[in-house]
Amino acid sequence: MTLAIGGHVQRARVCGFIVLFTAAVTFSAHAWSAPCVSPISSCTEWLTVPGTPGRLLLYRTYPLDTKNELVTSALVVIHGASRNADNYYRSALAAGFLADALDTTVIIAPRFAAGKARSDEGQECADKLAADELSWFCGGKENWKNGGAAGFAPGLTSFDVVEQIVRSLARREVFPNLRSIVIAGHSAGGQFAVRYAMANRVQDRVSVAMSYVVANPSSYTYLDVLRPTHAAMISRYPTLAPGYQRVPEPSQKPFVEFENAKACPGYDKWPYGLEERVGYSANVSNADLKRQLVARPVTYLLGELDILPLYGFDSTCSAMAQGPTRLARGVAYTKYVTEVLGAQHRQVIVPACPHSARCMLTSDVSLPVLFPKQ
């Protein structure tokens, strides 16, 4: 076990496990405390959006209202359907340690809590809420992962909340040396990330570079009636689409107008497509959604082994129209946005990773995407 005396965060590996702890260090009046590296109450704060009711809990390594000249980047990590922001915070901390970026990165993990469950949702969709805590439904179009409105604050969406986080980070009087903000999400958080990338209007209003990391979502948002064929899912990865590995006809196009629209009328409705949008995106035009998605830097992190219909896998006909597995859907969507829409998005297949946020976030191939070099 070796301690680096000069570092704020002391690091060690014990029996193969990553250990993070802070040493007792005396700081000058112009120095900054060590990052908070545990999902405990002292590492949390409540976020409010001016002019709106309610508040949202978030975990963070540094306070968002205390001047910090050490921080040069920010990582906002969005949890999955289980709303376990504390576990996602742990995974992001592990990734920050492996990237040697904990001291200079403010890591934030917001919690989009679930309030009273709808009649078609189980009790696992009802969290214990603090006073005035914002909450959302788990399912349906009007939920947090699609930019839906909060339960008792219909004018406030989950996308508005992350916009407020971005605005807080972009304040030069607090983070004068911040140069990049990464919005990353896994599973349901990946759905949030890709839809937030195309819809948000804050990116063009701040002076900090923003990028997006979309990891293993169960569905994407297509901007027209095209859907992938087998030709869009050809890959050197044999696990891509089990049962769908036949070689396509030479003349088969990778994307065609969806042929089963009559039997699957919801295939092009929000959040799978642009029809009948609700929440934040309802106030953004189709043209702006396309323009922003194409123009913004997005990386798709896809687990090589995320091929099983588990962990909330969306098996509706609208989702199945996008591919048979999460991996296949991600490969096809990357091809769609780059070849059909003309975006310059990237795709990274994460070796040996199934549907696991910890595996995805801490992989060697993921770290440069989550913690880009300045």
Model regions: which residues?
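A domain-start/cap signature at the N-terminus of enzymes
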Residues: 31-74, 82, 86-106, 137-154, ...
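Active-site nucleophile loop of the alpha/beta-hydrolase fold
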Residues: 112, 210-222
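Cap/lid segment of the alpha/beta-hydrolase catalytic domain
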Residues: 112-156
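Conserved acidic catalytic loop of the alpha/beta-hydrolase fold
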Residues: 160-178
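Gly/Ala-rich beta-loop-alpha elbow adjacent to hydrolase catalytic centers
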Residues: 185, 189
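Short glycine-enriched nucleophile-adjacent loop
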Residues: 190-202
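Conserved strand-to-loop "acid loop" that flanks and positions the catalytic carboxylate
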Residues: 299-323
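C-terminal catalytic histidine-bearing segment of alpha/beta-hydrolase fold enzymes
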Residues: 301, 305, 314, 331-374
